[in-house]
Amino acid sequence: MNSTLHRLQREIAFSLDGLNALQTQLQPPSRPHKWTIQQIMEHLLLSYSGTELALNARLAKRAPTRAKPSIPQHLGQYTLIRLGYFPHGRKAPPMVTPAPTAHLLCGEELTAAAAEHLANLDLLCAEAEELFGTTCKFASHAVLGPLNVNQWRKFQLIHGEHHLKQILAIRKAHSLSPIEQPTHQA
């Protein structure tokens, strides 16, 4: 697996380690209207599914998008992908907003679901890299516009880490902190 996506997979596993299905329903105590741990992960899973659809569409056409990034999209790409800053307080687009939880999942189940999506994304990114190279902005993100394969990987990492910080904060607030910090080695 590509080192960027592998790092994300390890960080997800660390963040969810040892949580049972009731613990994944915890929210920030001071902000009970915010998503639960499971809903945060479901948001990420919806994001991965959307990315899979976007990449599959371009791979099926065997042609990159003709879209060009707008000035706001250029700024968003620079801020998020180059600087690694994900803005706080933005409302998620409807297509990646999790529904109310109907089936409780434990941390291990959420980790497995994420690992499956990330493995699929890794295969799609590898295929896109082979077909389009690393610099061609071949597929468009709904907010950031056209991205190249490494930008797609980096987006997933930065977006994921943004939400994993929220999960770790919820765990800490409920005295459920994981034992060790993950290393950022490949």
Feature locations, PLM:
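Aromatic-glycine hotspot motif
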Residues: M1-A186
